[in-house]
Each structure stands twice: as C-alpha cells, then as structure tokens.
Amino acid sequence: MSWSVEKKREIISTFGRNVKDTGSTEVQVALLTERIDHLKHHFLKHKKDHHSRRGLLKMVAHRRRLLKYLKENNMLHYTNLIRNLGLRH
C-alpha cells in the first residue's frame, strides 16, 4: 500500500472541518496514525530497517504530543477521535 493523494484527501475529508483543513490537530493525528500503520506493515517484512524504525518512533511521539494537546484543550474532540481511530488512551 502506498501513501497516495486520494488516501490523504479521504482522511482530511473525514476528520477535517472542511476540505482544505490540513492543520487541525484531529487531521494531523489521523494522518500520523495512517503513516504509523503503514510502517508497522513495512516492519513485518523488513525487520532490520533501523533507520525507518527511528522515524516511526518520532511519529509516535509526535502523535502522543498532539493527543495530549487535544485532550487538554478539547476533551470531546479527543474522545471522538480516539474512538474513530481505534486508539487506546
């Protein structure tokens, strides 16, 4: 599965406030979650790809910070987002 423009548009339309909303916290978390899932499948085949693993860890940390920000500022959006994405928090 490649990271396509159509997939990005689909995520933005699902989690964004409008079509051009790419900067909201919800959209950023959803996009990061999609990239993290893509890399998880990559590591099933390429176990020794440590360079990409470091990038994965950075993405997970960034997503965690964004979720913390969202939880502190808008609990309703936070709970809806983690329910829709299937995250454990």
Curated annotation (Swiss-Prot):
GO CC entries: cytosolic small ribosomal subunit
GO biological process: translation
Keyword Lyase appears in the UniProt entry: no
MF term (GO), any: rRNA binding
Signal peptide per UniProt: none
Family: Belongs to the universal ribosomal protein uS15 family.
Subunit description: Part of the 30S ribosomal subunit. Forms a bridge to the 50S subunit in the 70S ribosome, contacting the 23S rRNA.
Protein name: Small ribosomal subunit protein uS15
Species annotation: Blochmanniella pennsylvanica (strain BPEN)
